[in-house]
Amino acid sequence: MTRLQDDFYEYVNGKWAETAVIPDDKPSTGGFMDLDRDIENLMLDITGKWQRGEELPEDSILQNFVKYHKMVADFDAREAAGVAPVMPLINEIKALSSFEEYTNKLGTYELAGKPNLMPFSVSPDFMNAQMNVLWGESLALILPDTTYYEEGNEKGPELLAIWRQMMEKLLPKFEFSEAEIKDILDKVIAADAELAKYVLSNEERSEYNKLYHPYEWEEFKTLVPELPLETFFTEVIGQTPDKIIVPEERFWKEFAPTYYSAANWETIHAKLKLGAALDWTSFLTEEIRVLSGEYGRTITGIPEPRPKEKAALALAEGPYSQALGLWYAGEKFSPEAKADVEHKVATMIEVYKDRLEKADWLAPETREKAIVKLNVITPHIGYPEKLPETYAKKIIDESKTLVENAQALYEISIAHTWSKWNQPVDRSE
């Protein structure tokens, strides 16, 4: 038997590891995954009853979730619809004729959740966590990290080949010709290889103290002179921003000026067409759902796709996650239990503060800053006291299609996210 002092992990977990099995549709197993599985099975049982009209919730928000889940889980209807629900978007993107036409529609596309290649976001300021500010990120790579693009990395070309093969099987489903597919993939892969030279590696992204690069708006907009950013942000947030935080400086200084240009329109158009085809794969036929996940399963080492019933529940839960969490907490985590945990956490914080005040091995300034941080912690225990106001807007129209309702939910979420710009962080969410 393994001795404690020789291998602590093996001593504690050895017997469990001998019999533990990773589910075919999961990347790992363990105590937390077991809990996740148990909750998933419970929700499958409960939501199954709701779909059958049994024990229906009285809450109007959850009633809309039930309607949405029914649509997502109506696999016969999804098979019958095929790709028809997304062809208008694909044809709209295909019809774009120029860089100018594309840039004129950027604001509209952003608010509608359509492909637009604008890597901007709103989140708290590193230096003032009380306020939400504008961030300029970068486009995403195909491969998991920049290191996969380095010369001598054998895994990179292998994964890229798997990605391309998946796309070559997937795109014909959306009425792209063989010539169109080759043109799109050639252009996207070439641009991706160039992009990899300028975006941060995963290791660089982990060094948060080096990611904070604030720019005055007048300076930032000169980095991409062919993008009408003032028009874009006026449409999206109602005005021109005053500043932007740029963690991806190489991307914006060395890649973006030539990428976002009329001269690069054909590459941009290829990327947009690919995005239009991929955006809705989770809502279409089972064949398309499974096929579109091949590359992701390869990266994560998951041998089998998630069963369609579980995938449908996860998809439907997305827009209603906090409402479902609140319902679950009401069933499993009483207000008394919540108050008890909140009291314990508050006690723990006071203990930390007391120990910091007596920690004479720390500099006084360090102790003071640590206590300041403890004083502003807002613990989130179990469930929120209120739901975001947007939840009341998430009303499902049963006369519309699944994709039309999902589109409406996306637009509500997008508008809510942008409304946070230049506003205090709501710690109750």
Predicted regions and their residues:
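Extracellular/periplasmic catalytic domains that process cell-envelope and extracellular macromolecules
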Residues: M1-L4, F126-N128
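Active-site-surrounding "flap" and adjacent substrate/cofactor-binding loops of secreted or lumenal enzymes
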Residues: T2-D7, Y11-A77
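Short amphipathic alpha-helical segments with coiled-coil-like heptad repeat character
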Residues: Y11-D25, E168-E180, V376-T378
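Secretory-pathway/luminal and periplasmic proteins that interact with or process carbohydrate-rich
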Residues: W16-T19, E194-E204, E350, I377-P388
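Surface-exposed patches in mature extracellular/periplasmic domains of secreted proteins
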Residues: T19-D24, E54-E58, E175-I184, L356-A370, ...
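Intrinsically disordered, low-complexity linker/terminal regions across diverse proteins
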Residues: D36, L223-L227, I245-E249, R306, ...
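Noncatalytic, helix-rich "gating/capping" subdomain that lines the substrate-entry/channel surface
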Residues: G48-H343, T347
